[in-house]
Amino acid sequence: MEPPGGSLGPGRGTRDKKKGRSPDELPSAGGDGGKSKKFTLKRLMADELERFTSMRIKKEKEKPNSAHRNSSASYGDDPTAQSLQDVSDEQVLVLFEQMLLDMNLNEEKQQPLREKDIIIKREMVSQYLYTSKAGMSQKESSKSAMMYIQELRSGLRDMPLLSCLESLRVSLNNNPVSWVQTFGAEGLASLLDILKRLHDEKEETAGSYDSRNKHEIIRCLKAFMNNKFGIKTMLETEEGILLLVRAMDPAVPNMMIDAAKLLSALCILPQPEDMNERVLEAMTERAEMDEVERFQPLLDGLKSGTTIALKVGCLQLINALITPAEELDFRVHIRSELMRLGLHQVLQDLREIENEDMRVQLNVFDEQGEEDSYDLKGRLDDIRMEMDDFNEVFQILLNTVKDSKAEPHFLSILQHLLLVRNDYEARPQYYKLIEECISQIVLHKNGADPDFKCRHLQIEIEGLIDQMIDKTKVEKSEAKAAELEKKLDSELTARHELQVEMKKMESDFEQKLQDLQGEKDALHSEKQQIATEKQDLEAEVSQLTGEVAKLTKELEDAKKEMASLSAAAITVPPSVPSRAPVPPAPPLPGDSGTIIPPPPAPGDSTTPPPPPPPPPPPPPLPGGVCISSPPSLPGGTAISPPPPLSGDATIPPPPPLPEGVGIPSPSSLPGGTAIPPPPPLPGSARIPPPPPPLPGSAGIPPPPPPLPGEAGMPPPPPPLPGGPGIPPPPPFPGGPGIPPPPPGMGMPPPPPFGFGVPAAPVLPFGLTPKKLYKPEVQLRRPNWSKLVAEDLSQDCFWTKVKEDRFENNELFAKLTLTFSAQTKTSKAKKDQEGGEEKKSVQKKKVKELKVLDSKTAQNLSIFLGSFRMPYQEIKNVILEVNEAVLTESMIQNLIKQMPEPEQLKMLSELKDEYDDLAESEQFGVVMGTVPRLRPRLNAILFKLQFSEQVENIKPEIVSVTAACEELRKSESFSNLLEITLLVGNYMNAGSRNAGAFGFNISFLCKLRDTKSTDQKMTLLHFLAELCENDYPDVLKFPDELAHVEKASRVSAENLQKNLDQMKKQISDVERDVQNFPAATDEKDKFVEKMTSFVKDAQEQYNKLRMMHSNMETLYKELGEYFLFDPKKLSVEEFFMDLHNFRNMFLQAVKENQKRRETEEKMRRAKLAKEKAEKERLEKQQKREQLIDMNAEGDETGVMDSLLEALQSGAAFRRKRGPRQANRKAGCAVTSLLASELTKDDAMAAVPAKVSKNSETFPTILEEAKELVGRAS
C-alpha cells in the first residue's frame, strides 16, 4: 500500500517525488534537497563505510543483509559518482552533513569524518547516494513509517500485534533519524495507546501475548528514544512516563528491567531539570492507583527469587532517583522512605552477590549515603555554632511539632527526661547516653531514617558505655587529683612554715656566730696586744737589767774610788774644794723625754739648771696629713719609769748639742713645719711615721682623728654654699695626682675641652636610652604611668628587660594597621543592686519570771529547747572543757543568751526555790555556781575557734608568699611585660610617654581600653593574638601564676588584724589562767587544759607571725622589683589587678578564637556556596556531555550512551569533595574545610606568606582589607 506523499514529513515527501526519476536527475535533486528539502537516505553498511573512514559501527547483526548484496558495486560503474564531479564543494559539504545525519552517528563519531579531505567526502557522498537509491527500489521488502502507524491503529492483537511490534522495533533501530521523525509523535501515541490498553486489561494467563506485547512496546520505545528527537517527543507526552512506571512489574522481569533502565536514563537527563521528580510523581500516581507503597515494586524486584539483572536495574533506578537531587533533605527523605520499606535488610542480601554491575550500584548507593550523612553532621555543627540558646532551640522545636502528630511524642520525650534520676554523677551519664542514641537515630550513617516498622533498632552504645566507664575513671582520677592538690597545698604550707623556722634558726645561728666571732676577734687582738706588750717589757727589762749591771759596776767602781779617796783623805789633810754638780743621768727608756733634774747637793744654794725644752711635734706630712701621738696601753696605763737608783747618785744630763745648733721655734721654720722629732728610743710606745707614698700610688689615706687632749691639725673650713668646694691638693712628685671627688660631693665635672655645653647625662645601672620610634601614622596611645631612669633601682625588673628582641617590622605593621584611627568609645556602666531580706521573729508567751526579763528568758528557753541536755550535764561539760560535746555554736549562743553576772548572782540566791522557778531561771541557778563563767566561756570559745583561725590565716599567708615567688620566677610573664613595653613605646612615639623604661603593673588592666581602628579589637586582644601566633610560650603565664587568684582575695589589713586579735586573745587566756582561782570542783579541768592550750597556741602564733613577716618581706621585695610602693598599693589591690589581667587575657584568647571561628565560618560559607555552584555547573556540564538536549541537530545513540553511563556508574559520580578527612562525628566548629575547598579559592584569596624581612606595611594592609571584605 502506497502512502500519500507530501504530508508525512519532509523526508518521505522528497522520496515520493523522486520516484521514477533517472539517476542523472539526482544531483539536481540533491542540490534542491540541500536547500529546501532533505533526502531520505538509507544507512550505509559497515564494510562500505570502512572503505572510506576505517570506522566500524556497532550492532552489525541487526543491519539488513540486502546491503551486502549492494556493496559489491564499483565506483567506476556508479553514474552518481560521475555526476558529482560537476557539483561544487559547498554542495558536496551540504550533502555530506545530510549523510552524517542519516547515518545516525553521534558527534564523537562524526568529528573524524569531517576531518577527511574533500575528495574523500565527495566519494563517500556519491557512494551513499548510490546505495540509498538501491534501497529505495526494494519497496516490497520494507514498510514505511506510515504503514506501521496504520497497522498499529487497525486494532491488532496477540500474535499479529507482536509481529508488527517486532518489525517496528527493527525498523526503528536500523532506519535513519529521518525515518524516526516520520514515525514521529503520531506513531508514539499509537504505541502508548496500545500499552495503556494492555495495562488496563487484566491478564488471564501468565504466558499470554499481552505481557509479551507490553515488553515489545517497551523495547520499541527504547529504540524510538535512542535519539534526541525521540526523547523530546516522549517527554512531551502526558502519560508516557506513567506508562513506563506501570510497566515495572516484577512478574515480568525482562519488561521491568527495560522499563527501569529507561526511567533511570530519564532521571539523569540534564534538560529539563528535575526529571527525577517527574518520575517520582509518576511512581506516586501508580502507587495510588494500585494502593501500594510507591517504591514497593522496586523492593519486590530487589528481593530474593529474582534475577541479578533485575536487581541491578532496580538498584540503578534507586540511585538515579536519589543522586540528581540537589537538596539534602530530599535525598535523605527518599533514602529514608526506602529504608522504612525494608531496603536495609535487602541491601545485606545484595552485598553477598558476586556481580560487577551489582557492586558498582552498591558502591554508588553507599558513597552517596555516607556523603549525605557527613552533610547532616556538618549541619549539626552549624546548629551548634549558631543556635546555642536553650529557649530559642526549644521554641523552634515546639513550633515544628505543634499541632502535628509528633507533638504528643515530643511531650512524652520531655516527660521522660523529667524521670532522669536526680543524681549529680548519674545525670550527666543519662544525658550523654540519650544524646548518643538520638545522634545515631537522626544522623544515621547511611544518610537515611531508621526502619520504624522494625522492632529491632540497632544502636551502637557499647563504645559509649566504655567511654562512660573511662569517664568515671577519669572523674575518680580527678577526685584523686583534687585530693592530691589539697595535700600539695598542705605540703606547701608546711614547706613555708619550715622555711620560716629555718630562716629564724639561720638568723639565730648567724647572730651567735657573729657574737662568737666578735669575741674571738677581741680575744685575738687582746692576745696580740698582750704579746706585744710582753715583748716590749721583756726588752725593756733586759735593757734595764743591763743598765743596772752597768750602774752597779759604776757604783762598785765609785765605791772603790771613794774607798781609795777615803784612804787618801785619811792620809792627806782635808781641803775645801768647790763641789761640781753631778751631771744628771740620761733619761730612761720609755720616758717622755723630760729630764729629771738631780737633787741639789746638801748645802748647795745654786738653782738647778732649767730642764731642756720638750721635743717638738712631728712635722705634718704633705697635704695636711699628720700623725697622731701613739695611744697609751690598754687601760690607760703607761710604762712607769724604773725605780731610782740607790744612794745619792744622780743620772748625768745628756751631752749638749753640737755647736751652733739650736732648736728653733715651730713658727720660725718655713711653711710652718716643725723639725722632725728624734728617733724614739728602743722600747718606745710611739708609732713610727708612715713611709712616704710609692710613686704612682693614689695618695695617702686620711689621718686618724687626734686623740683627746692631743693637738692636731685644725679641720679645714667648710665650703661656702654654692661654691666649688675645696680644691684638691697638688699631686705628689712622680704621682698621678689625686682623682677628683665623686659626683654628688658638690664639685661639678669640668666641661669638655673647647665647649661650654654639658654632655648628655649618663644613665645609671648600665641602661641605654630607649629607641624612639617614628610610625608612619599616629597611633592610639596607651595611657600608662611612665617610669624614667631615675625611678629604677639596681635589682628591679625594668633594669634587666630586653624588649628589643621582640622587635620586628611585621609587628609594627600590624600595630599601625590595627591602631591607626582615633575614635572615642563610650563604655557603659552597669550598677548592681541587691535586695535585703527581712526576718520576722514570732513571739511566745512565757511564764511569770522573778529575775530575768521576758526577752532574755524567751531567748534562753529557745536555746535550751534546741540543746536537749540536763542543766547539770551542761555545767559539767563546761567545767571539764569537753570538746567532744561542746561546739562553737553552742558556746556562742551561751555567751549571747547567758544572763548578766548580777542576774546570775541573784538567781544563785534563789536556789532554795529552784522548783518554783521557770526553766530559764533554773538554768541560771545551775550555771551561776560556775566560777568566772563568762571569761571561762570566752576562753573555751577561743580554744574551739583557734584551729579554724589558724586554717584561715595560714593559707592566706601561703597564697601571697607563693604568688610573690611565682611572679619573680615566671619567665613567660616577664616576656609579656617586655612585649607590652615594646608595643607601648612604639605606639606612644612622639608623645610624652615615649621612651619609657617601664610602666606601672596596673596598666595591664587598661590594655583593653585602647581600641583598634575598626573598634573590633583591643590592644589586649592584639597582644594575645601576637603571643598566640609568634610567642606561644608566653601563653603559659596564667598557669605559672597559679596562686595569684587566691592572693587577690587576701586582705593584708584584715590579716594583720586577725593576727593581732589572736595575740590579744592568747594573752587574755594566759592572764585568765594565771589569775584563775583554785578549783573547788574535781571536775573543773579548765586550768589544766587551758595551760597546755596556751602553750601550743603561742607556738602556733609565733610560727604564723614569722610566716607573715616573711610574706611582708617578699611583698616589699616585689615592690622593689616592679617599682611600686607596697605601702600605697595593698596586697589585695596588686594581686587583684594581676588576677583581673590574667582573666582578661584568657578571655581575649577565647574571643580571638571565637572571632577566627566566625571568620572561618563566613569563609567556609562563601566557599561552600561557590563550591556548590561550581559543582552544580560541573554536574550540569557532565550530564550535558552525555546528551545536550538544547543543541541543534538530531543526535542518535543517546539512550545507549545513557544506559552505558548508568551501568558503569559514571552518571552518579558527584564531585562534592572528600569529607572524611575534614568532617567527623562531633567535630569541632573550628575544623577547616577540605583541602579541595581551599585549593582553588582560598589559595587565590589569601596571599602567600612572605618572610618577615621583606614584609611591608602595604602588604599587611592589603591582607587586612581582603580579610574584612571576605568577612563582610
Swiss-Prot record:
Coiled coil segments of this chain: 468-572, 1039-1196
Cellular location(s): Cell membrane; Cell projection, Ruffle membrane; Cytoplasm, Cytoskeleton; Cytoplasm, Cytoskeleton, Microtubule organizing center, Centrosome
Positions where Phosphoserine occurs in the chain: S7, S22, S36, S1251, S1254
Residue ranges with Gly residues bias: 1-12
Domain FH2: 769-1171
Post-translational modifications reported in the UniProt record: Phosphorylation at Thr-768 is stimulated by cAMP and regulates stability, complex formation and mitochondrial movement.
Record lineage: Eukaryota, Metazoa, Chordata, Craniata, Vertebrata
N-acetylmethionine: residues carrying this PTM: M1
Free-text comment about domains: The DAD domain regulates activation via by an autoinhibitory interaction with the GBD/FH3 domain. This autoinhibition is released upon competitive binding of an activated GTPase. The release of DAD allows the FH2 domain to then nucleate and elongate nonbranched actin filaments.
Impact noted for substituting T1238A: Substantial loss of phosphorylation
PANTHER family cross-referenced by the UniProt entry: PROTEIN DIAPHANOUS, PROTEIN DIAPHANOUS HOMOLOG 1
Protein's UniProt name: Protein diaphanous homolog 1
Primary role: Actin nucleation and elongation factor required for the assembly of F-actin structures, such as actin cables and stress fibers. Binds to the barbed end of the actin filament and slows down actin polymerization and depolymerization. Required for cytokinesis, and transcriptional activation of the serum response factor. DFR proteins couple Rho and Src tyrosine kinase during signaling and the regulation of actin dynamics. Functions as a scaffold protein for MAPRE1 and APC to stabilize microtubules and promote cell migration. Has neurite outgrowth promoting activity.
